[in-house]
A protein has these predicted regions:
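Histidine/acidic-residue-rich, glycine-tolerant segments that coordinate divalent metal ions
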Residues: 1-107, 189-190
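Metal-dependent amide/peptide-bond hydrolase catalytic core
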Residues: 67-264
Length: 264
């Protein structure tokens, strides 16, 4: 919803923005930060395949759609990694596969969906068209028709230096000197990125792993974050907001009376 909120004037007269995201790999009472990109660019890919179906005893009379689908699923990620700089971290992974209703019938339609993620925003912009081309090229030898829905998602969240420093200082004041941990750039996507295309800001990882708890992944069904993290997140966000307001007040006072400020 970030794009729609920005279009409706959310960031009008807003000098900076802050956000948090739960992280089950960071301990309760700590936050994860980094200057620069903290998330990745992310797109959604939907592929609708069609071809002549038929009996599994005579695949040569069909386009053998499921075999074609399997080749697209395997070859598209592999080809993209060869056509982009490996350091850009292009990743295509599939989350949905659907085709067929019977074990002895080759279907005439199939569906494949997933995401493309990229650490580097410039490569992300280039890889979009490249992805569509590769899908078409892989599908052609099998005779299937591939209709691609490539939904451009979000760029990386890029934390600015000043705002990240504000946030870290607020967290240290609230939680202690050892409360800050450096986190790696995540392959996840976050639409807060669009806000930081408009104003400077920073997003941090809120630790939710209680002492003795196993490490979960965000989308695991049994992930149960510690509820104590809620209060910690509120404290850090409130303290950060107050620091940001004081910074703006000090800047305004300096601008209003530069001579007096220089005399000090």
């Amino acid at each position: 919803g970030a794009v729609q909120m920005i279009a409706q004037g959310l960031l009008k007269d807003i000098p900076r923005a802050f956000a948090l995201h739960c992280d089950p790999k960071v301990d309760l009472g700590q936050i994860g930060t980094r200057i620069g990109a903290i998330t990745s660019a992310s797109d959604t890919i939907k592929i609708h395949l069609s071809g002549h179906g038929g009996h599994t005893s005579r695949p040569h009379l069909t386009e053998d759609l499921i075999y074609a689908m399997s080749q697209i699923a395997v070859q598209v990620p592999a080809v993209l990694t060869r056509r982009t700089d490996v350091r850009s971290g292009v990743l295509v992974a599939w989350g949905q596969v659907s085709a067929g209703v019977a074990p002895n019938a080759i279907p005439a339609e199939g569906y494949l969906a997933g995401t493309m993620r990229c650490l580097d925003v410039e490569v992300w912009r280039q890889a979009g068209n490249m992805l569509d081309e590769v899908i078409e090229q892989v599908a052609v030898p099998f005779g299937v028709t591939a209709r691609v829905e490539h939904i451009r998602g979000v760029p990386p969240v890029v934390n600015t230096d000043l705002e990240t420093t504000m946030l870290e200082n607020a967290a240290r004041a609230e939680l202690g000197e050892d409360s800050i941990v450096l986190v790696e750039q995540s392959m996840g996507g976050e639409d807060f990125a669009w806000m930081l295309q408009e104003v400077p800001g920073s997003m941090f990882r809120l630790g939710t792993r209680a002492p003795g708890d196993p490490t979960y992944d965000l989308h695991q069904g049994d992930y149960a974050p510690s509820e104590q993290a809620i209060g910690i997140g509120v404290r850090v966000m409130a303290a950060t907001a107050l620091r940001a307001v004081r910074f703006e007040l000090a800047k305004a006072a300096k601008a209003a009376n530069p001579i007096r400020d220089e005399a000090r």
